Every structure is written in structure tokens, then in C-alpha cells.
Amino acid sequence: MFKTTLLFFITALCEIIGCFLPWLWLKRNGSIWLLLPAGVSLAFFVWLLTLHPAASGRVYAAYGGVYVCTALLWLRFIDGVKLSLYDWSGALIALCGMLIIVAGWGRA
């Protein structure tokens, strides 16, 4: 389960970076060259999703829980926004959902 969660976390970072760089280009007048590493990051994100042993729908559903937590970590450490009790509560619920889905992969 740790390996799966770590892989989800790395996958989420690739997705967030792949979306953040075009955002910088569009919203903060960043260089158009930001689109090149964004494309690479998103391609890597898609490839990482293929490494999971479950059906794609289950992978996407379980990945969503880790994505929520990773996005909130990004909010805190990259955007510099303090997390609220609601943020922490939502992340915990999402992570619990992910753990339930992953625990059932071999039983479905």
C-alpha cells in the first residue's frame, strides 16, 4: 500500500506541475517555454497512471484521494496559504476513501 500511495503522490505532483506551468504562462505572463516542461510533466503523469495493477477506473478513483492531499500540500508550501480545519478534514476523508479502494483491489 505504501508503494501505491507513493506512486500516486509522484503522479499527482506531475499532474499539478503540468497544470501549474501553463497557469504561470497565462496568468503571470511567464515564458511560453513553460509549456515544454508542462507537456513533459503531463506525459509522465499519464505514463505513471499506467503502472498501477488495477482497472483504470479504480486507479483514477483512488488517485483522486491522494491528488486532493497533494494539492493541499501545494497550496500550503508553494502558494503559501495556511490550511484550514476544513482543508485538513476534507483531505483526511479523501485519503480514507483512497485507502478503502486500494485495499479492495485484490478482492474485487
UniProtKB/Swiss-Prot annotation:
Pfam families for this protein: UPF0060
Lineage top rank: taxon: Bacteria
Cytoplasmic side of membrane: 27-30, 82-84
Residue spans crossing the bilayer: 6-26, 31-51, 61-81, 85-105
Cell membrane recorded as keyword: yes
Family statement: Belongs to the UPF0060 family.
Name of the protein in its database record: UPF0060 membrane protein YnfA
The species this protein was found in: Escherichia fergusonii (strain ATCC 35469 / DSM 13698 / CCUG 18766 / IAM 14443 / JCM 21226 / LMG 7866 / NBRC 102419 / NCTC 12128 / CDC 0568-73)
Classification lineage: Bacteria, Pseudomonadati, Pseudomonadota, Gammaproteobacteria, Enterobacterales
